[in-house]
């Protein structure tokens, strides 16, 4: 299964796929330099769940629009990862907060509605720090605690944004041309057992 797809906004011939069907095994990043006609496989020590709950969340992997060498990938179980060489090598971003979800998964209902890890990465392309995007937003599938984080220094440090809702899980996050974030929420990562949701914006 494919967990996430990213296209270089500066070169649409460069395509990245995060591949792995279930989190019981590690996956791979596939990279194409020719618009998807051929791919290079880069094995990574990251558990992916392209056929698990939350498979419609996203987008987990994004290319920095101000520096195409930088790619961020939000994982289900292994935190936030970054490549600085166009996807050829990957390293965990240790400065990102611990977003482990403490839930009793012995309850079948809890297992069905558990979060799906880091579900979205969004770059603000309007501000630069050095060669990189200065402001990076990350959404995590957390229900009862803060779930949207921002870095104002190109990924060196992170904090939760102010005045965010709790009680629902983020499912998608995008930034409009006016730099406003739009975040959709639901009571489950989906596609199963989703009965409630909301849409919030953040200036």
What spans do the regions from the language model cover?
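Extracellular glycan-interacting surfaces
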Residues: 1-203
């Amino acid at each position: 299964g494919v967990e996430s797809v990213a296209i270089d906004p500066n070169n649409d011939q460069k395509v990245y796929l995060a591949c792995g069907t279930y989190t019981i095994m590690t996956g791979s990043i596939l990279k194409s330099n020719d618009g998807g006609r051929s791919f290079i496989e880069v094995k990574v020590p990251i558990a992916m769940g392209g056929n698990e709950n939350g498979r419609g969340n996203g987008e987990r992997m994004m290319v920095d629009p101000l520096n195409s060498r930088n790619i961020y990938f939000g994982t289900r179980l292994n935190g936030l990862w970054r490549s600085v060489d166009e996807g050829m090598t990957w390293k965990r971003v240790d400065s990102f907060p611990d977003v482990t979800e403490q839930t009793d998964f012995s309850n079948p209902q809890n297992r069905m509605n558990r979060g799906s890890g880091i579900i979205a990465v969004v770059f603000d392309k309007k501000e630069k720090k050095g060669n990189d995007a200065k402001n990076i937003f990350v959404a995590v599938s957390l229900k009862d605690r803060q779930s949207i984080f921002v870095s104002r220094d190109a990924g060196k440090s992170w904090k939760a944004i102010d005045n965010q809702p709790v009680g629902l899980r983020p499912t998608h996050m995008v930034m409009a041309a006016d730099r406003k974030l739009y975040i959709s929420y639901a009571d489950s990562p989906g596609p199963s057992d989703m009965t409630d949701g909301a849409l919030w914006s953040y200036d």
